[in-house]
């Protein structure tokens, strides 16, 4: 996807979340308790737009999903990790709405890549928009026995070289040795 002319889209994500926080007397959403937010929806709906509320729902849920993903990895539970990644992706699409630009709704390459990923990987892998969204890349966790077919499909639909396979190291990029 093309990242040109997306500054307003990226700014709207932050701006709308901050508008919800300000409507609750705070500066940022991390200063707001979810239950207080949820109980204030009727009042908030009069102060901010609907998309801002949806993005706030994404924010609160995403923090929980990150905790779940970290815990899953710490406990070597890759199935739960994949579930958290996929749930995060659905939330990005439905609530954060950062998979395509509302300025160009007919260009939805990321949406199509996510759809294809779901059809190919459902129940076996995980997929989500990567980075800030609107254009660019998705992230997919593909089982080794499905990798060739997945890569072939993505490259066939989006062009040769569209699918880049990354190997995840079992340890971080830096390691402290005592």
Regions found by a protein language model. Name each.
Residues 1-128, 140-178:
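C-terminal nucleotide
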Residues 135-138:
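N-terminal pre-core extensions flanking Radical SAM catalytic domains
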């Amino acid at each position: 996807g093309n990242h040109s002319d997306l500054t307003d889209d990226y700014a709207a994500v932050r701006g709308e979340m901050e508008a919800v926080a300000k409507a609750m007397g705070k500066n940022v959403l991390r200063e707001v308790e979810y239950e207080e937010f949820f109980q204030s929806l009727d009042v908030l709906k009069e102060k901010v737009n609907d998309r801002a509320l949806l993005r706030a729902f994404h924010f609160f849920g995403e923090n929980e999903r990150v905790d779940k993903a970290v815990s899953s990895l710490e406990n070597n539970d890759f199935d739960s990790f994949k579930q958290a990644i996929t749930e995060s992706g659905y939330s990005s699409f439905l609530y954060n709405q950062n998979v395509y630009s509302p300025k160009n709704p007919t260009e939805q390459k990321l949406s199509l890549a996510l759809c294809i990923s779901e059809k190919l990987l459902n129940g076996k892998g995980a997929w989500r928009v990567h980075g800030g969204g609107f254009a660019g890349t998705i992230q997919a966790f593909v089982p080794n026995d499905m990798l060739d077919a997945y890569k072939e499909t993505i490259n066939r639909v989006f062009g040769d070289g569209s699918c880049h396979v990354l190997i995840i190291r079992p340890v971080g990029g830096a390691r402290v040795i005592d």
